[in-house]
Amino acid sequence: MELGKSTTIRSIMNLINKTSGKVLIENKEFDKDDIEIKEKIGYLPSEIYLYDDLTVKEMLDYHESFYKKDIHKRRNELIKKLELDEKKKIEDLSLGNLKKLGIILAFMHKPKILILDEPTSGLDPIMQNVFYDLLKEEKSKGNTIFYSTHILSEVSKICDRVGIIKDGNLIKVEKIEDLSKKSLTFVTITSEQSKEIAKDLKVNIVSEDGNAIKFGNNLPHDELIKKLSKYKIDRILI
């Protein structure tokens, strides 16, 4: 289901026209002709379209030519970390390697603001961890990272604040620690005392089937197990 994450990012980047509202970056309204702000942004779209007939090296050379400052050293650092072959043609790159190239293009000019749309899709688990380390490095420099993902584990690893979008509307913005306190895990218990357990825990039953009940739990697991220890339970699934 399309929630509006990519549309929001494309709107921020002035790739599509906004129907209402405005985008402020560094307390300044950002429009498509503002070169000064654009140079501070590293953008990674969810789908990457580049010049297929170029090699990786030629694409990076072309991108580097737009910047007056020396970014060659940073470019080489990123190539080494992400293990990308510069000799390959873009049309021959796998989805994972194309994503690596997109990451390098977004990061190599040392931007102060990173706007990343589903950046880990296509990366294997090892490269995902390399990417997370890159983000932590950028964060330690005081740079801003605007990150779109539907993977909740990434949110907890990376983010300080979380904005939740539903049906194209931003419905909530919270600090990650506050959101974590409210997060639920679903528990299924099979017991002849299941109704009594639900009443004792003060939970709402999501579904039930005979002696089995499913409910949302926000207690730490050790505390939940301690509360359940006084009951005879045939089966528990967390």
Indicate residue ranges for each PLM-predicted region:
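Helix N-cap at the start of a conserved alpha-helix in ABC-type nucleotide-binding domains
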Residues: 125-127
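Catalytic Walker B motif of ABC-type/P-loop ATPase nucleotide-binding domains
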Residues: 114-118, 123
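Conserved ABC nucleotide-binding domain
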Residues: 72-94
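Helix-to-loop junction immediately C-terminal to a conserved catalytic motif
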Residues: 13
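ABC transporter nucleotide-binding domain
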Residues: 131-216
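Conserved ABC transporter NBD signature motif
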Residues: 21-32, 36-37
